[in-house]
Each structure stands twice: as C-alpha cells, then as structure tokens.
Amino acid sequence: MKKAKGIVLDKPGKADYRTPGSFRIIVLFETVSEILERLSALHLTSAARSLGLLHPNECGSLAGLGCFDAVATLTHEFRLLQAASFKVSTLFQDVKGGFDNVCENKLASILTRGGVSPYLIAWIKSCLSKCQCRLIFQGAPKVFCLVAVGTTQGSPISPLLFVHYIASLHLTLPKGLVISYVDDLTIMHCADSVPSNIRALQPFPGITKWQRADLLVAFSVPKTELIHWRTPKDRSDVSFAPIVINDMLFPPSQAVRLLGYWLTPTIHSSVHFLRRLALAKASFSTIRQLSVASKGLSTWWNRKLVFGPILPILTYGCDLFIPDTITLKKLNSFLHGVLQWRTNCFYTTVCSALYREASPPPIFSICKHRLWSAALPLVCAPSKFNPATARIPESVPTWN
C-alpha cells in the first residue's frame, strides 16, 4: 500500500527544462491507500478545528474553503482599510519546496503538542516513512525505489499536513493581517503612508527566519512580490517604494497573480480577464487541431471540448470580478470564433443563428451564475471556519 507510481509533469513557465526543478512528480497510490488518506485527512481536519490548531485565516486544503475565500478575504480587508483613509501594502511570499522539506519527526512533535490523538500521529508517521515510488516516463526503469522526501504531491493528506507544519509562520501584526493558502503567504499592513508600510513589512521575513530554519523551509525569491493598493479615485502620486529583504530589492508590481486571480493596485477586472482570454486562446489553438472540416472529432465531441476546457479557463475569476463592457466584447468575440468552429459555420454567420445552433449560455449569464454560486456557500458557511464569511456584515442573513 506504500508503493506508488510517479507521473512526471513539467511546470509551466519555466525558462530552462534541463534542471530537475522544472518538473513536478505527481504520486498515484493504490485506490485503497487514497481512500484511507482521504478519511484520515477528514478526521485530522475535524480534530484540528476542535483543538484550535488551524489559523483562522488559513484557507488551503480545508473542506468548504477554496481560492475564492482567500482572495475575497484579502480584497475585503484592504478595501475596508482604504475606506478608513489608510494606505495599504501587501507582501506575497511562497514557501520554496515546502512539501519536500517536511520532517516527519518535527510534524509529529507539532501535532503532539496540539493534542492530536497518538494513534493518528502514529498513522501519519507510518504514512510518511518507507514509501516507494516508480517513475513513469519513456525509458524509465520499472523498479520501485525508496522515497526520502517529506510529503508526496498528489496525496489527499499532504497539503493538510503541510498546513499544520508551517502554522507557526502565522504572526499577529498590530495593523496587519496574514492570510495563507497552503504554501502561499500574504502579509498585509496598513498605515498613514506607504513608507510606513514598508518599514512594518520589511522585518517580517527576519522575524520568521528562525522558525523557517527550524522547519527547514525558505521563501522563494522569484515568487516574492509587493503591491501598494490604490483606489480608482486616488489622485496622489503612484508610489514605487520598494522593499529590501535579505539585501535584495523588490519593487512594487503592477499585476500580481494570486491563486489564479490577477490583482492590480486598483483591482481592475480587465487585467484578469485579458490574461484568462490569452490562456483560453492558447488552449483553443491546441484543441482546434483535433478536429477540422470533414475529419477529426465529431460535432458532439467539439461541444464537449468547448464546455469542458475552454469556458472554465475563460470565465475563471467570475466569482470575484465582473468584466467591464470593453472586456466583455472581447470575450464574446472570442466565443463567437469558438462557436463557429464548433458548428462548422462561416465566421460571418449571424450571432443569433449561431447561438441557437450551438446553444451555449452567454458569457454575461455565466459570470452572474458563478457570482451567485460563490455567494451562496459563503453565507451558509460557519464564520468560525471561513474567514470570508466572518467579514460579512451582521445585516446580511448568514448561517450564524
């Protein structure tokens, strides 16, 4: 039950694929092992919540929480502080190679101090030790080898174990907030000026240095970013004040990618949707090669490809952002070309006839549906488990 197959996948956006760090190994255990890990993850989550081991602003690898909750909490906080006339800055950091550096003995010590059941701790230590893996790629030897790393990627319980492992990195800031999603940490601070925010954020990596050294983890330098939030009506000079961390200069970014959401200093939705449009076009250029006129996939399978990969890529983020009129026209123009390929019609076909033939939902309707679908779980979630729900005004009816 500890033998697994490792699927080697390349990480997108890497400059050089000649180094091992440019690839990711997804581990596939036997079905019974996956089921046991999933059940243990549910049991550990329940125990951790009852014992208070999870930070209230942790949104990763927990049932009922997702990327939307983390980003919604972040945007709500800095908009609330901006309404109080504060300047808000945020530092984004990523734990480098976090899953590989988890020490089972230190993890067991953390869980023991938290009061977790000794039987569950013993099961976790057994799960992390003496695992064997066989890599799957062309020309690979079909032999199993012992894996001497922390937690395996692809395991249902690995992200949850990592969340407990780095829980000590959540610090309490007097005028700030720390939000995390597994290995992504977001540190926000507010003050009367941007330089004051820089002075408050700059010591954070140094404060956590001894904790990170004890846990054998470090922050990734290329993924460290800074942003100074602004309101659309702010007429003051744009601040380009950088932050210095470990003798390295990090200037503020004009667009930051957080959990698939593209954030700008003024939270303009066009940047996010134009990035999603570029990804959808790249996917469509690959998919359309599978089917051309009179050959390839059938029309029914073409429709499956449109509603399967393309629309989710194009509309990701509609639960938080609403596209403006100009961006919506660009999205509809791209969708028109996709539907023309799906129905094998001319590009100049009247839109009304094309939409009746292809029968897709309009982009604007999809955005509204995604927005409502995200709001419903938000108001139904317990506020002590969901940080975004905890920030809903008392006048709004919620589960509580």
Where are these regions (language model features)?
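Short, conserved micro-motifs composed of acidic
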Residues: 139-140, 217-254
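Mobile genetic element proteins and their domesticated derivatives, centered on retroelements
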Residues: 6, 24, 36, 40, ...
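Basic, alpha-helical interaction scaffolds
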Residues: 247-321
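Conserved pre-catalytic core of RNA-dependent polymerases
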Residues: 1-152, 189-190
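Inter-domain linker/hinge segments that demarcate the starts of reverse transcriptase
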Residues: 42-44, 70-80, 195-216
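Catalytic palm active-site di-aspartate
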Residues: 3-6, 24, 57-61, 88-98, ...
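Catalytic palm subdomain of template-directed nucleic-acid polymerases
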Residues: 97-115, 174, 185-210, 231-234, ...
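RNase H-like, metal-dependent ribonuclease domains
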Residues: 242-245, 326-400
